[in-house]
Curated annotation (Swiss-Prot):
It comes from Caldivirga maquilingensis (strain ATCC 700844 / DSM 13496 / JCM 10307 / IC-167). Keywords: ATP-binding, Kinase, Nucleotide biosynthesis, Nucleotide-binding, Transferase. Its EC number is 2.7.4.9. CDD domains: TMPK. This is Probable thymidylate kinase. GO terms for biological process: dTDP biosynthetic process; dTTP biosynthetic process; dUDP biosynthetic process. The gene is tmk. One of its GO terms (cellular component) is cytoplasm. PROSITE patterns: THYMIDYLATE_KINASE. Pfam families: Thymidylate_kin.
């Protein structure tokens, strides 16, 4: 057995880069690491990604929350749980808190979102990456997504507020992701290694 880590934050905050660099360094330090993301590669996850997100299909927020929850059950039972049992530090980009933040910002009751996700385990550690919206805009612009940001600025601000409120309520660590990437990664590494002590095998020791 090892641990399950969820890295959260709004679009453009740097989750993918931080997870990739963190995983590389954890492996260098002797840990088994498995990275994943949501929507997952399950049939439902692929449907969400290709038929809804990539095509900008309008879907009732409550229905979308149910689709994410269904994908999450498959993702947890078929990928996350087995890998944790095999001794991997599993790091996912997005999990339950993404549904809380995004569908919650679309008017879906947070209590209901949590209830429909109660069939999967909570992570051992949830890390929220945060950055000013102008930093996020710059990063999305570099990815050719400035138009997306400009269309969704108010929504992303609302999502960010939900993340920060949840972090306060649930004592999730919030990392300033506007800094130099090495500093961000070092903070995430410290949090994960502290949680992994006594639970995950380090093959360098």
């Amino acid at each position: 057995m090892c641990i399950f880590v969820d890295v959260e934050g709004i679009d453009g905050v740097g989750k993918s880069t931080v997870i990739r660099l963190t995983a590389d360094e954890l492996r260098r330090r002797g840990y088994l690491v498995y990275t994943t993301s949501e929507p997952s590669d399950s049939p439902i996850g692929l449907f969400i990604r290709r038929s809804i997100l990539e095509s900008n299909l309008e879907v009732e927020p409550m229905a979308l929350a149910l689709l994410f929850a269904a994908d999450r059950v498959i993702h947890y039972n078929r990928v996350i749980k087995p890998k944790v049992k095999e001794g991997y530090i599993v790091i996912t980009e997005r999990y339950i808190e993404s549904s809380v933040a995004y569908q919650g910002s679309q008017g879906v009751p947070v209590e209901w979102i949590i209830e429909v996700n109660s069939m999967v385990a909570e992570p051992d550690l949830v890390i929220v990456l945060n950055a000013p919206l102008n930093t996020v805009a710059s990063r999305l612009s570099n990815r050719g997504m400035l138009e997306y940001f400009e269309r969704n600025t108010d929504f992303l601000r609302s999502v960010q507020e939900v993340y920060l409120r949840r972090a306060r309520e649930r004592n999730y660590p919030v990392i300033d992701a506007s800094r130099v990437i090495n500093n961000v990664v070092n903070d995430v590494l410290t949090l994960i290694e502290d949680k992994a002590k006594g639970k995950c095998k380090n093959y360098n020791q």
